[in-house]
């Protein structure tokens, strides 16, 4: 951690200032930029401003230019996801619905047949795997025996966020007991890769 000892005249003594340790180091910024570029998760219009903001946080100035140089080739050859959709704001809005336990209505385009479905859902988590962000949610009012291969499975349904064509956060809330809450970390342990 980067810390400095500074004299504080108001307190009449020296204090340990750890303000600098709260910021990312240049090497940490480089690592995060590399991870983002490798993820290929966003269109350039959303990815590049995030990279630029991270790089601008580098100090001193020569480090800023060094990080720019170190990622310049990957940035130039960056391959956007095939879906070509912007969704960063959607991630935030869905995350807010999850946090507030708001019911949502989504229009979703299925991967395997392109069919569109409207679902009323209880969103419980956002995951990332293999180039895509996913929404984990429980479907309200669905006949599990009719629509699910394993009706006894209590796991949420997984939706690729870029395939959600429209969504609306409803004023209605759903109850979730602490013991039944969805845990992204546990899901990650059980499912290595989710394919869209």
Per-range role (PLM):
Residues 136-196:
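Surface-exposed, charged, gly/pro-rich loop-and-adjacent secondary-structure segments at domain edges
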Residues 15-19, 76-78, 114-118:
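Short, solvent-exposed polar/charged micro-motifs at secondary-structure junctions
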Residues 1-31:
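Short, basic/aromatic recognition patches that contact phosphate-bearing ligands
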Residues 96-145, 155-157:
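Loop-centered beta-sheet repeat module
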């Amino acid at each position: 951690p980067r810390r400095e000892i500074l004299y504080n005249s108001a307190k009449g003594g020296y204090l340990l200032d750890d303000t600098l340790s709260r910021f990312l180091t240049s090497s940490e910024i480089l690592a995060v930029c590399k991870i983002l570029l490798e993820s290929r998760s966003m269109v350039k219009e959303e990815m590049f401003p995030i990279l630029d903001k991270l790089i601008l946080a580098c100090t001193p100035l020569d480090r800023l230019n060094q990080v720019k140089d170190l990622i310049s080739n990957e940035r130039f050859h960056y391959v956007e996801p095939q879906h070509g959709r912007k969704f960063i704001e959607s991630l935030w809005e869905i995350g807010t619905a999850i946090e507030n336990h708001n019911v949502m209505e989504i229009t979703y385009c299925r991967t395997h047949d392109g069919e569109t479905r409207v679902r009323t859902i209880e969103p419980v988590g956002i995951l990332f795997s293999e180039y895509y962000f996913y929404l984990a949610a429980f479907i309200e009012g669905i006949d599990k025996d009719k629509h699910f291969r394993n009706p006894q499975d209590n796991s949420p349904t997984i939706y690729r966020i870029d395939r959600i064509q429209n969504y609306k956060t409803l004023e209605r809330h759903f109850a979730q007991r602490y013991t039944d809450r969805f845990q992204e970390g546990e899901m990650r342990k059980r499912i290595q890769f989710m394919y869209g």
